[in-house]
Amino acid sequence: MAEELEKSMHKEESLMEKIADKIHDHDSSSSSDSEHEKPESPSALKAKIYRLFGREKPVHKVLGGGLPADVFLWRDKKLSASVLGVATAIWVLFELVEYHFLSLVCHILIFALAALFLLSNAHAFMNKTPPKIPEIHIKEEHFLMIVSALRNELNQAFVILRSIALGRDLKKFLMVVFGLWIISVVGNWFNFLTLVYICFVVLHTVPMLYEKHEDKVDPVAEKTLKELKKHYMVFDEKVLSKLPVASLKAKLG
């Protein structure tokens, strides 16, 4: 009788343990499901958003950071407005007033030298110490740094042009030809100085506006690029793939 009582108690304990295990498993599974269904953080969602040209850095970093990026993005409004104002004054002076660059440089030098000459003689006449004119010289290391950076950019451009001329990349060839054609068309509308001024104004407006509205611009840009890729694939299939260059490249590949 005692043994049967012990067996029944043992069965009840094992049954209670099974029920407790099932409850525990259900709680753990529900908690894991809730973790999976938990919405991602805003930073993670923002990281997955498409950015224009596939960039992963902020606009400030893309522009190189430092003072130039601060000027283009209007971090310091007074400095940015001053730079844009000086550029506008130069453009008005040369284009609208039709002042010549060589004449401007000569007149500025004449005015500066005359003012310093008269000031130095006036101080000597009044027995005062003449004004200190600082020595101006370009450091060799800075000059070599600029020349080296320019040389690297030119060499990289020559490598790209050579690879295009050898017919290795038809897509790049068409893009470069189209870009040069666009530049030639724009060059017929404006002279060089006006074109430089327009680019300068664009650099002072477009990055700043894009940084403010990038969350609205990027989805539109993503859709546009997808449509362009679709059209390019159709063009590649119907036209480019039938060209002798493309077939020769496929055979060599």
Swiss-Prot record:
Residues 23-40 have a biased composition (Basic and acidic residues). Its main location: endoplasmic reticulum. GO terms for cellular component: endoplasmic reticulum membrane; plasma membrane; plasmodesma. Signal peptide: none annotated. The modification N-acetylalanine is found at A2. The chain crosses the membrane at residues 78-98, 99-119, 173-193. This is Reticulon-like protein B6. The gene is RTNLB6. It comes from the Eukaryota. It is found in: Endoplasmic reticulum membrane; Cell membrane. It is a multi-pass membrane protein. Residues 23-43 are annotated as: Disordered. GO terms for biological process: response to bacterium. It comes from Arabidopsis thaliana. Residues 68-253 form the Reticulon domain. InterPro entries: Reticulon (IPR003388), Reticulon-like (IPR045064). The lineage of its organism: Eukaryota, Viridiplantae, Streptophyta, Embryophyta, Tracheophyta. Keywords: Acetylation, Cell membrane, Endoplasmic reticulum, Membrane, Transmembrane, Transmembrane helix.
